[in-house]
A protein has these predicted regions:
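Short, glycine/acidic-enriched loop or turn micro-motifs at the edges of active sites
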Residues: 99-101, 125, 150-152, 210-214, ...
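Hydrophobic packing residues within well-ordered alpha-helices of enzyme cores
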Residues: 108, 131, 159, 217-221
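Acceptor-substrate binding/catalytic loop of class I
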Residues: 125, 179-186, 236-246
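Conserved acidic-Pro-Pro-aromatic motif
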Residues: 49, 193-290
Length: 290
């Protein structure tokens, strides 16, 4: 036995033990990650996507090059999808702004049925193609998709896109962490214009997840939100709104000005949401005051 070990200061011994335990835990974590990656990659059987059952009635293609696909496989935003399934009824209209490959829209389409509608807006051409494939996969005739973005005025905007798996982070706001590698020009409209021929009283729920562009989408739907009373689900992410040049608190204030109250969903229950100092990542629910 090395007797000199016992002559060392206790803090030195404790530090060494701590480093050993930390290295051991990192090694264990790395093994878990490696096993998880191996399992995930094995699901594709050499293909670029595989068909996954969201539930007994709805299928979705998940893609090997998409981080969002893996998140969906792991039960991404379960609280939010449960909320949508609880709120929507047959014959309702659901508006999905920032649809991506269609997680929420596919589930909604099954619920609202042939008497209802799902309106989708997805500006990224490659993501839109995958969305279209998922609609076809389920043979849904009640989903109407548009390859455009929404903002506070019509026209054309620069859209920043990822080529390395971060397609769910595509945004009209430039990224500060180099996730978005290139840019394209895409057409944009306003929500008020896009809903002009829709029976707006039938719109039960609007979901807005546009990576920091939420403020501009809401302002582009001002007439609709003030005149009608849809439930609105909005992503609050401070870093995204910072990239777009404003504070996430402006989203909170805009909907309050439109006559709404904010809630959060926890265990399928709505809880009143007072304004917080910081929102790292939350999906909040706005409901019109009665």
């Amino acid at each position: 036995m090395n007797k000199s070990f016992f002559k060392r200061p206790l803090y030195h011994i404790a530090g060494k033990i701590s480093r050993i335990m930390r290295d051991f835990q990192k090694n264990q974590d790395d093994k878990i990650i490696d096993a998880s990656n191996e399992y995930w990659n094995g699901l594709f059987n050499g293909n670029i996507f595989f068909e996954y059952n969201l539930n007994n009635d709805v299928k979705i293609n998940l893609y090997k090059d998409s981080i969002l696909s893996r998140l969906i496989y792991d039960g991404f935003e379960k609280e939010e999808t449960d909320f949508i399934e609880k709120i929507l009824k047959e014959g309702d209209v659901f508006v999905d702004i920032g649809t991506n490959i269609g997680l929420f829209s596919l589930l909604a389409a099954k619920i609202v049925g042939t008497e209802g509608k799902v309106l989708c807006f997805e500006p990224a051409p490659s993501t839109f193609y995958r969305l279209k494939e998922n609609v076809t996969l389920n043979n849904f005739k009640n989903i109407h998709i548009k390859n455009i973005g929404l903002s506070d005025e019509p026209g054309e905007l620069t859209f920043y896109v990822s080529n390395n798996g971060y397609d769910a982070w595509n945004s009209f706001a430039p990224s500060q962490d180099n996730k978005l590698e290139s840019s394209i020009q895409v057409p944009v409209s306003t929500l008020d214009f896009e809903l002009k021929d829709i029976n707006k009283s039938k719109i039960k729920l609007v979901k807005i997840d546009v990576e920091g562009w939420e403020k501009f989408v809401l302002n582009g739907g001002k007439e609709f939100f003030i005149e009608f009373s849809p439930i609105v689900m909005v992503e609050f992410t401070e870093s995204n709104t910072f990239n777009a040049g404003y504070s996430v608190h402006e989203i909170y204030d805009i909907m309050q000005d439109f006559g709404y109250v904010w809630y959060t969903v926890k265990n399928k229950t709505l809880i009143l949401e007072t304004k917080k100092l910081y929102y790292p990542y939350n999906n909040l629910i706005a409901i019109k005051k009665s």
